[in-house]
Amino acid sequence: MSDELIHVVIALGLVISFGLGAITAGVLR
């Protein structure tokens, strides 16, 4: 894998994790 692709995958993972965390926090509250 190229470094750029790895960075993109990591960035997407962080965005998805953050989004799910925000949604979960919103639902729990």
Curated annotation (Swiss-Prot):
Keyword annotations of the record: Host membrane, Membrane, Transmembrane, Transmembrane helix, Virion
InterPro entries named among the record's database cross-references: Inovirus_G7P_2 (IPR045539)
Cellular localisation: Virion; Host membrane
Membrane topology: Single-pass membrane protein
GO cellular component: host cell membrane; membrane; virion component
Keyword hit for Chaperone: no
Record flagged with keyword Acetylation: no
Family from the record: Belongs to the inovirus G7P protein family.
Name listed for the protein in its UniProt record: Tail virion protein G7P
Organism: Enterobacteria phage I2-2 (Bacteriophage I2-2)
